[in-house]
Structure formats: structure tokens, C-alpha cells
Amino acid sequence: MGYGREESPEGNLDLIRYLQSWGLREFRDEASYYQWQRSILSEEELRDLGRLIEHRHGGEQVDCDIEFYDVLARPDLVPVLYSQRFNYFLTLGSSICSRIPPANRVLDFGCGVGILTSFFAQQYPGVEFVGIDRSSRSIEMACLEAEKRQLTNIRFEVSQVPQYQLSGTYDLILSTQALFQAEREPGLPSRSWRTFQREEDFKRQEQLEIRTGLQGRLNALLSALGPVGRMIIFEKTWNLGRRIFFQRALDVRGLRPISAPVPCRYWSLDEAVIDGPLYEVSRLSKGESSVWNEEPYREPGETLYRCVGRSAHRMGLELALDQVLETASGIHSRMGSWIFRFGLWNQVLVWGFYENSSGFKGLVIGGEEDRDLLHHVFETIKQIQEPDFERLVRDFWGHPANARDDSAIPCYENHHPSAQNIYEALPSKHIQQESTFQNGEGREMHIELGATKSLAYLYWANTFDQRQLVLIDEERAHILKAYYRESLESPQGPPA
């Protein structure tokens, strides 16, 4: 099963107004948020919070976690601290809310102060909701808020799962970032740096489930799930090693996806976050088989890379020697005459090279999988009217006056899983130097320096799905040699 289409929460005015009723505010930049935070909290309170966060992240102990969320449940702190998650609540709340029907009895596991639980109860007054959390202060606040909002179809309980048995059964169980909380756990490694595939290692799977606490929590929830019940789950499982580990934990318990898992994208202040995916699962019927996607998520356009100036010029000339598929040209009243070439390099890289008589040069390169997307850019440039032409060029490559023309800028760089496809397809590869490191825990890292046609390349890969491919013209190959040496000195990863 593939991935579902991302859903936009922007039109959910009910949820926006509801979050605002908690005192939450939406911020799109860190500076504004922290200025507002400092206007509300004293220096001493900020220092105490900082110490509490350090204490919590110093270990995975349950007591640290409970203490952390007990403090956060202060009525004066909730608006300040949870405003950082405004977009998270908006995105998750919208996605989950539409999936609640036809449930009649819903359990929200790890409900916190009940922000989303109470919203769901408000939207579905005929449905019974139960929220549980191990933080007693969070539950106290959740109860007060539900009473204030006169919600009669909801109750909250303190419960430490799996230490305490859950009572009753539910036809829908919700869990958002509460089942798999070991954030530093990378999950299952791949078989080697050459592949994204995992071994079927049941012993390692079970050991990880026990170590992370997932086994006990998931088993406890399943004991409370009705025979035809569903679970809607959103965890921090975007990294493939974590995702496959989590999916296999669901699969071994007879759970299957009943809708395509949906990636969730939201803003955390000024940082764009993609996480999840959001799973909707139920028990397998007799004779049914489950289909879980264990491939990396490929985002449209992820292979595309843009550069300007000398890097664009050098690489553009090299690419044009192979195959120019189409050319468009014209004259702009402000930018002068221009030409845009669209081509294919050795059946591996698609590219578009733009230059004008004002001296600006811009290049965009991508993998074959983004060929249609890049060709659409070419068609847009070819057909766009003059008033919008300059804005399009600036949006795509930046303002010419601000363009960096650093001689160390690569001609192409890719930090996504798709880098592996391009690396494997590079023509006439000649490996000049390579090193592979292992630490005995399934972690393996490979770094390779080489040449392909008249380009130099650096490739970096490990068994937790990180990939990096850098291409540069031969004249500047010494830059990649320096990167290679630095990486050998610090084998945790390539230099930024």
C-alpha cells in the first residue's frame, strides 16, 4: 500500500477558534514567539523550564517524563508552551476528526491536557470519549477544561499503561506521539549501506519493543480494542528504520492498514516538519494478508537542486555536451535576452539551464523521476507573460543581486533516499577512494570518492537510510577530496 495524499487543515475554522479559546496563538517565526514567551514568563521560570527539559532528555525514565508534563499542565503555562504546537494540533486534529465516525466509544491514549480530546467530544456529542494519561496534573486540567466547556460525553482518567489494566472495550483507539516515545531510537538498520531493505529478525524486533516500551503499551491497547475496532495512530516514525520497526510491531499483532498512511506536514514555528505517517488500522480478518510499505517515501521534486553563477555555468556547459532536448528564448525589457535549455545527461540527470544577457546564470538538475516536473518548469517559462517572468526567475533561483557565487558550491547535491538511484545510475563510475565503517550494532557507513564521465562525485550512505550525493566539475574535484578526508576523521557523517 502506498501513501495517501496529504490533507490541508487550513479551512478548519472551528478548530482554529477552538485552539484560540485555550489561549494558543499561531507563530510562523521563532523571534516573534520567543519575544512573546519572554513577555509572559519570568527569567526564573524560563531557567526552571530549561533545567526541566535538560533533566527529561537526560534519560528515558518514566518519572522524568511525568514530572515534565505535570509542570507543563499549569494553566498559565499551557498557552505559552503549547502555542509552539499550534500547527501540529491543527493538522492532526483535522486529519483525525474526519476519521472518527462511525465510532461510538473512543479512547484517547496519552491525551495530555485534553486539547484534541475535548475538541473531538465537542464535534461529536453523541460519541463517548475517554482520555487517559500518566500525568495526574494533565488529567486535572483536562477535567477542568471539559467542565468549563460543559462537555458531558467525555471523562479523563490517570492511567499508567501497561502497569494498570485498561477497563472496558472501545471501537476506536487514538494515539498521537504516545506509543513510541523513545525519540533517540533509530529503529531497525538495513542489511547494508547499499539497500533500504531490512532482515526479518524477530529476536531483534522483540528486543527493541521491550527496550522502547512499545510492547507493553501496544499489547495493553489491543486488549481494550473491540473485535471490529480501529486504531488511529500518529507517531514519530518518519525515519524509515523507526517506521519499519513500528509497522512490524503492528503487523505481528495482526493489524493491517485499512486506508493509505498519510504523511503529515506542519509548521513548528519557522521549521517545516513532515512526520508520521498517520495510520488507520484494524485487525485482519481470517484469510486476509496485510500489505505494509517498507520503501522510503519519495517526495515529488526531492531530487531537484538549484545553483547559480560559476557552478551553474560550469555544470551547464558540461550537461549541454550530451543531449539538449528543447530550447526556448526571448527578450525581456528589464532582463535582456534570455535562453533556457532543457536536456538529459546520460539518461541519468534531467536539467534546465537559464541564462540572460545581464550575466545571470541559473541551473536546475534532478533525477529521471522528476523529469515531468522539470519539463513543466520549462513549459511555464516558455509560455509565461513578461510581467510574471522576472518574478518566476527570482522565485526559482533567488534575486540575482543576492545570488551566492561561491566557488565551493557543488554543481549538484542530494540528501534524500533518491540519491542512491542517481548514484547507482552514474555512467562510467571510477572509484578513486572508499571506506566502510562498522560498529558491531548493525550500524555501517560507507563513503566513496570517484569520477563519472568528466565530473567528480562524493557518495555517503549508512544503514539508517541517510544518503548524500555531491557532483562537481573536475576542475574543482579537490573540494570533494577535502570533504572525503574530513569525513574519515569524523565518520559519524559527512561535513555539512
Language-model-derived ranges and their functions:
Residues 135:
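Conserved SAM/SAH-binding beta-strand->alpha-helix loop
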Residues 85-102:
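Conserved alpha-helix/loop element of class I SAM-dependent methyltransferases that forms part
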Residues 67-90:
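Class I SAM-dependent methyltransferase Rossmann-like catalytic core
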Residues 150-161:
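Conserved SAM-binding strand-loop segment of SAM-dependent methyltransferases
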Residues 142-143:
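Conserved SAM-binding loop
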